[in-house]
Swiss-Prot record:
UniProt subcellular location: Cell membrane
Protein name (database record): Casparian strip membrane protein 2
The keyword Cell membrane appears for this protein: yes
Reported function: Regulates membrane-cell wall junctions and localized cell wall deposition. Required for establishment of the Casparian strip membrane domain (CSD) and the subsequent formation of Casparian strips, a cell wall modification of the root endodermis that determines an apoplastic barrier between the intraorganismal apoplasm and the extraorganismal apoplasm and prevents lateral diffusion.
GO biological process: cell wall modification; cell-cell junction assembly
Parts of the chain that traverse the membrane: 60-80, 108-128, 150-170, 198-218
Topology, Cytoplasmic side: 1-59, 129-149, 219-227
Ranges where the record places region Disordered: 17-37
KW Cell wall biogenesis/degradation (keyword) present: yes
Length: 227
């Protein structure tokens, strides 16, 4: 009986002397590599403020989009102002009337159509320009817009130059050809057509900026790919 009790005591003492097993801590996660760190760092920065070629191309694409929206105003205003420039002048009675109509001059007709076409093109090019903001590496879209913008520069410049010549004759006349100025009688007609010509030349300047931006974006993309 005593031996059994002694064995039991020895067994309890051995169990009390043991320490509980501690859990082994998991190994630390591997440190992220440099590209991963850069990606995480760029993820918290707005895409327009990111450094590097991609952020620069996005800024240029956004500027291109804003310029297209800005160019729609002058072209549309020039087309509407020319189309509504007709004026009637009554002399003595309503039976003797003189009219100044824009479609009496082929230059004004061409001018109105060219500005309307340019405004429609700018409206249709907005989705392509917005796609360039989302995908700044899409060189094919930039090249297509560059070609179309160049065509619009030529078209609007030719139309504005032709209309400017007619407006000058309407204001100053031509003594050698015995053409008298008509703006002294048709104030509204000359005012509308003159404003339309100024707006059209403003649109030409914006188109030139668009061509310059498109060429710079394509050239920078080509240089980055080459290196």
């Amino acid at each position: 009986m005593s031996s059994t009790s002694e064995a039991t005591v020895i067994h309890m003492d051995g169990a009390a002397g043991k320490t509980p097993a501690t859990a082994v801590p998991p190994p630390p996660p591997p440190a992220p590599t440099a590209p991963v760190q850069q990606q995480r760092k760029a993820g918290g920065v707005p895409f327009l403020l990111r450094s590097g070629a991609e952020g620069f191309r996005r800024c240029m694409a956004l500027l291109d989009l804003l310029l297209r929206v800005a160019a729609m105003g002058p072209t549309l205003a020039a087309a509407i102002s020319t189309g509504t420039s007709d004026e009637t002048l009554s002399v003595f009675t309503h039976y003797f009337q003189f009219r100044a109509r824009f479609d009496d001059f082929s230059a004004f007709t061409f001018f109105m159509v060219a500005n309307a076409v340019a405004a429609g093109y700018l409206l249709m090019s907005l989705p392509f320009s917005a796609f360039g903001v989302i995908r700044p590496k899409a060189t094919s879209v930039r090249l297509l817009l560059l070609i179309c913008d160049t065509i619009m520069v030529v078209l609007v410049t030719a139309a504005a130059s032709a209309a400017a010549a007619i407006v000058y004759v309407a204001h100053e006349g031509n003594r050698r050809a015995n053409w008298v100025p008509i703006c002294m009688q048709f104030h509204g007609f000359c005012k509308r057509t003159s404003g339309a010509v100024v707006a059209s030349f403003l649109a030409v300047l914006i188109f030139i900026l668009l061509v310059f931006l498109g060429a710079c974006a394509i050239r920078r993309r080509h240089t980055t790919t080459k290196h």
